[in-house]
UniProtKB/Swiss-Prot annotation:
FAD binds at residues 17-46, 285-295. It comes from the Bacteria. SUPFAM superfamilies: FAD/NAD(P)-binding domain. Signal peptide: none annotated. The lineage of its organism: Bacteria, Pseudomonadati, Pseudomonadota, Gammaproteobacteria, Enterobacterales. The keyword Oxidoreductase applies. The keyword Oxidoreductase applies. This is 3-(3-hydroxy-phenyl)propionate/3-hydroxycinnamic acid hydroxylase. Pfam families: FAD_binding_3 (PF01494). Coiled coil: none annotated. It is an enzyme of class 1 (oxidoreductase). Belongs to the PheA/TfdB FAD monooxygenase family.
Amino acid sequence: MTTSTPDIQPAVQHTAQVAIAGAGPVGLMMANYLGQMGISVLLVEKLDTLIDYPRAIGIDDESLRAMQAVGLVNDVLPHTTPWHAMRFLTPKGRCFADIQPMTDEFGWSRRNAFIQPQVDAVMYHGLQRFPQVRCLFSREVEAFSQNGDGVTLNLKGPDGERETVRADWLVACDGGASFIRRTLNVPFEGKTAPNQWIVIDIANDPLATPHVYLCCDPVRPYVSAALPHGVRRFEFMVMPGETEAQLSEPHNMRRLLSKVLPDPDRVELIRQRVYTHNARLAERFRIDRVLLAGDAAHIMPVWQGQGYNSGMRDAFNLAWKLALVVNGKAGEALLDSYQQERRDHAKAMIDLSVTAGHVLAPPKRWQGAVRDGLSWLLNYLPPVKRYFLEMRFKPMPQYREGALLIDAAGKTSPVGKMFIQPQVTLESGESVLLDEVIGANFAIIGWGCNPQWGLDAGQIARWRAIGVRFIQVVPAVQIHREQDNAPGTLRVGDTQNRLKSWFAQHNTAIAVVRPDRFVAALAIPQTLGAQLTALAEKMTLATGDTARTEEKVA
């Protein structure tokens, strides 16, 4: 595919293995992971700095696990509020749906409030760890072309000067209005909500109550959310005929805030903005050497806080695959699994977000009355109440095709689902989360057995070439028994008995876990060799002889 290019000869030419368009959260996460794996990256952003105003306010356990994988979670956590409940209220203030999951199966609180600009800044500063990763601001992509060898981008710099970038691959993280997606003529079908919302952020929280509340007022629905560092967010529906300029006038701002505050004049306004809620999904996520991620691939209403988190899932899913391909350790066909695995789940999250929006602001007033009455009755049924409290309605990613081996158990199988992350005990006696042992790698995790047993030297070399960690899990009381140590296998103690319970529940002994923490295959010691051979073929892995064995971790 070729686009028109300016006739002016560029003064500056850049090269990189991967070019990323857009320094938002998805582009920053991609750059951090690829940098960690030794890939040269050029990140280009048309703005002159990172966006400094709050947008997303919810980060989930899967996204925190991605932050952990790139070594940034400890810097991110101070900008979060864990265990952040979401409560739907009737116009009279009665809570009819309380979403307050207390599970930590993936190592972190499932629902967390956060300040996005500060977390974005953490990811941006994280790039300084990698000398081969560069970020160029004030660079607009004017045109690009691709062939079988790579992608060429034509950039316009801050003073109008022309620059070119030559990269093996391009990841488009350039937002919902993606120039790259539009240039490639990829359909972006869906709907735009008829009503806009005005978002008001206030410092020194004048309300200071915890959690987030969605008030289903038929006159003007609104949201009230407590955020870290003393920030309060209010969101009000913009009614027909109202404009951002009108609502931003002092007397109208006072009128809005009087619904939620006893003294709307005593506030420290940070900013206000009007947003439109869209629900759209790209028809394709990969177009030859160009890959779409984040809002460039899908956009959704904010009501479940999943736009940001869906973008993080894209980055975590795509980055490790792209690293393998760029480093010559897997064939390009592995990248086809990105769309296979991510598109259906992104659509499910869009549908959930649209439904939540209809609960908050039903299109018809009578639907609100039915909602209130039905929810009041259902809350007296313990299973229904737990369904909301534990956030079981959230579609958890479960891949049924892609870079994995589906087994006969089908939907009940853990293959294609995220592996748990409990605390484990090291041989030193230290207690850590499991991912700290795995690192940014594949892991072959066996309960009570050495997962290398039964594998031939060629298989071990092939998987070590892509950085696999062989891990043996034992009861914590056995961790100091040196006679059980096997060369090349890490041993951890099952501190909380959760790993034993997981393997028992699924009637298996060994799990092959991908770098994005999804289970790729199951086995017992006698079948692991055959499973690894089949999985390597499915992922088009290079053989142990041809793969570059050095592990590039900054």
